[in-house]
Amino acid sequence: MRKPQRGYARQDRVKEQIMRELAELVRTGLKDPRAGFITINEVEVTRDYSHATVFYTVLNQDTREITEEVLEHARGHLRSELSKRIKLFKIPELHFKYDESLERGMSLSALIDQVAAEKPVED
């Protein structure tokens, strides 16, 4: 007999919930005006839920370093607020990493456009 398929693995559901809640907390809970406009792109959680790596980007690249400092400083507060919103046995320790995939994608796109512009048009 076949086992019924599960829609989402629990770890995936937890990752998505952490991502949603952190996005809301960062938007409404960070009071530091130095922080730029922060977007939470992805969350990776270890199997035992002890650590979560949060990938983020900022709208203004000039505020990238300051935003990193603000997030590191607010890490404990954000974890505490997460514990009030998410019912888990263990709330993961948060680690913030700037998501460079967007920048890499844009530079690759620019390189492709450059090569396409240099290539002569064939009739």
Curated annotation (Swiss-Prot):
SUPFAM superfamilies: Ribosome-binding factor A, RbfA. InterPro entries: KH_dom-like_a/b, RbfA, RbfA_dom_sf, Ribosome-bd_factorA_CS. It is found in: Cytoplasm. GO terms for biological process: maturation of SSU-rRNA. GO terms for molecular function: ribosomal small subunit binding. Belongs to the RbfA family. One of several proteins that assist in the late maturation steps of the functional core of the 30S ribosomal subunit. Associates with free 30S ribosomal subunits (but not with 30S subunits that are part of 70S ribosomes or polysomes). Required for efficient processing of 16S rRNA. May interact with the 5'-terminal helix region of 16S rRNA. Monomer. Binds 30S ribosomal subunits, but not 50S ribosomal subunits or 70S ribosomes. This is Ribosome-binding factor A. It comes from Neisseria gonorrhoeae (strain NCCP11945).
